[in-house]
């Protein structure tokens, strides 16, 4: 029987690559995104029987509850991930990253989802010395990292209190297909690769 995976933030850089991988593995995928970020649109057609695209906000409990039925696995990537936006509007960051994550956890719990996979951030390590390890204390220096690490705490609580299996990944510098090419949020590794491809030195001083 085909597994059904729900991916939030499916129109984004990491989410869209994850959807492709899940499809390659034979999963049916429910793609969730509000398409609010610049240049983020669904990459798959409704005509493909393995994909369903749903434009809905993760803070919409009723909307999320309606599409969670029959889902086996949830990959929760949707978030306010832009640092400057979170600093300028911390209330909105908390709404998306804390409330949105709690809505997703509750809907997953009610639907009997087998596993909930949460995408967090290495920003939670803050000024901890390198190399970073899981046993280091959290050191959240801005609303983005604070709200994302709060999401981790909710994942742990839903596991301990309700028995929902949760997994947390803290991403560092992610790069790949459809990653931002330029601007504040372009991965530094991608920038180095473009410099190399253009025959330029990797760092200009």
Protein language model features and the residues they cover:
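N-terminal Rossmann-like NAD(P)+-binding domain of SDR-like oxidoreductases, especially those catalyzing
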Residues: 1-174, 196
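Glycine/proline-rich active-site loop of Rossmann-fold NAD(P)-dependent oxidoreductases
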Residues: 149, 174-190, 198-200
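Conserved small/polar residues in nucleotide/adenosyl-binding loops
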Residues: 203-205
């Amino acid at each position: 029987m085909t597994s059904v995976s729900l991916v939030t933030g499916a129109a984004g850089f990491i989410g869209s690559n994850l959807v492709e991988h899940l499809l390659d593995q034979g999963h049916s995928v429910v793609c969730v995104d509000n398409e609010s970020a610049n240049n983020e649109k669904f990459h798959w057609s409704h005509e493909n029987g393995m994909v369903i695209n749903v434009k809905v906000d993760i803070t919409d409990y009723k909307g999320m509850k309606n599409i969670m039925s029959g889902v086996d696995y949830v990959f929760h990537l949707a978030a306010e991930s832009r640092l400057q936006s979170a600093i300028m509007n911390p209330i909105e960051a908390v709404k998306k990253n804390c409330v949105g994550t709690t809505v997703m956890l509750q809907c997953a719990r009610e639907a009997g989802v087998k596993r909930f996979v949460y995408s967090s951030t290495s920003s939670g390590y803050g000024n901890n010395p390198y190399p970073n390890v899981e046993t280091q204390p959290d050191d959240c220096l801005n609303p983005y990292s604070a709200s994302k690490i709060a999401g981790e705490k909710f994942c742990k609580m839903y596991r301990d209190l309700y028995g929902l299996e949760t997994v947390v990944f803290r991403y560092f510098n992610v790069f790949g297909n459809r990653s931002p090419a330029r601007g504040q949020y372009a991965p530094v590794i991608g920038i180095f690769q473009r410099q190399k491809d253009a025959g330029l030195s990797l760092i200009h001083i």
